[in-house]
Amino acid sequence: MIAPLRVGFVTGATPDKWARSWRAGRRESLHLVPVTEADQLDGVRDGSLDMAIVRLPVDRDGLHCVRLYDEVQVAVASREHLLAAADEEVTTADLVDEQLVRPHSSGWRPTAEQLEWPPMSEQDAIETVAAGTGVVILPMSVARLHQRKDVVRRVVSDLDPTTIALVWRTERDDDVTQAFVGVTKGRTPNTSR
């Protein structure tokens, strides 16, 4: 029996189109495994995953890394928040007086003194802002995943997008691995690298 290819995917990543393409053209089965952003490299490093679709930045030491796509960042707030009146886009200047209920991954902080919030998941952060307390900035895909009727999201146009990438250990560079890389890059059985 051929061993399955085990691929982790970080919260919000969308591996479905690649999984469909893989299953249509390969004998090896594909096992998709959800991983959190905090633990996104653990399975690749310990060998329980062959590859992972991750959100950069990550420690790339000992890993191959192929960029897949970028995601815009969005501010999420209660429907009752002033942000709800804004157009589809805001800038960080529009957010300088806000309380971030979760630190932003880029390190950007509003100029307003920030309260000490306990660590919380993306879902917990959205529940907190839905209650009318503060704002959270997340990748669009994560905000969509946890969408609620009582929150709004606005693109933060001057924050760099986050990047989704495929990573795998440098010593694992076999045909199956390269075939999956090819699938993520749009290659078909009739094309080559």
Residue ranges and their predicted role:
Residues 1-34, 42:
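Short alpha-helix C-terminal cap/hinge motif
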